[in-house]
Amino acid sequence: NESTAHFQAHYFLLPQKDLNQNGKNIFLMKVFVQGKGAISNKIFISDSEYAFQRANDITFMNSKVYMMFVGGMFSAFLIFLSIFLFNKKCREYLDFSMMNLCSIGFILSFFASDLPLYTSMCIPNLIFFKFSFCICALLSVFFTSSFLVSFFGEKENSVVFKIRLVLLFVEVFLIASSSDFWQLQTSMKVCLVLCVLSMIYGICFPFRKIFQKENRKNAVILMIAFFPSVCSFLFDFVNKFILGDLLLPFTSVFGWQITIVI
C-alpha cells in the first residue's frame, strides 16, 4: 500500500562521498502520485544537523501542533454525549458531541504519519485521506449546522433536514467514488459548494434569532463563539488557496478550538 508524509517535512540523508564538494550537485527526484502531486516547499541541501532541525520545525508547525487539540475534543465528545444520553430531549448536546468527534477525524490527517494504524500500512493513503480529511470535514459541517439550529431548543424543519441529509449523501458518494487525488480534488470542490448551502441555513438561524428578545442573548453568545472560526477560515482561504502559502499552519483549526471552548 502507498503512503505519504502528508503535512510533515521530508528529510533525506545524502552520502558525503556522492556529493561534489567543489561544484554544483544535480539531483533527479521522482514524485509518485495518484492523479496529481507536487513538491510543496523549497528544497535545500545543508549539514545534517541544520536540515534535521529545520525539518522538525516545519513538521511541528504543520503537523504535530494539532495533536494537543485531540484530547480536549475527545473529552468534549464523551461529556456531551453522556449528557445527551441522560437527557435525550436536548438534541444540541448530541450535535455538539458529534461535531467534536468528526473534527477529531479531520485533524488526524495532519499527523497521520505518527499514527500506528496508518504507518503500519493497514490503510491505503487515498482511502485514509478520503475519510479523514474529506468525509470527516463534511460531517463536521453537517453537525455544526445542526447545532446552530438545535442550540435554541428548536426542532429542525423535517423537509430542510432531509434536503441537507441528501446533500450529505451526495457529498460522501462523490468523495468515496473518487479513484485518485485528481478526481478527489475535483469532487471536493463540488462538495464545498454543497457544504456552503448547508452551512448558510445554520448560520442564518442565529441571525434571525437575534431579533427575538427571548433568544437574543443566546444568539449573541453563539455569534461571538463562531467569530474566531469565521475569521480564521477566511484567513486560511486567502493565505492557502489564493497566496499559496505552505509554511504557516491552518489557523482555522485554532479558531475552531476557540469556538469549541467558548
Description of each model-found segment:
Residues V70-F74, S97, V166, M223:
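Hydrophobic H-region at the start of alpha-helical membrane spans
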Residues A55-N87, M188-Q212:
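First transmembrane helix
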Residues I104-I262:
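Interfacial "cap-and-anchor" motif at the non-cytosolic start of specific transmembrane alpha-helices
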Residues T4-G71:
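An acidic-aromatic loop/edge-strand motif
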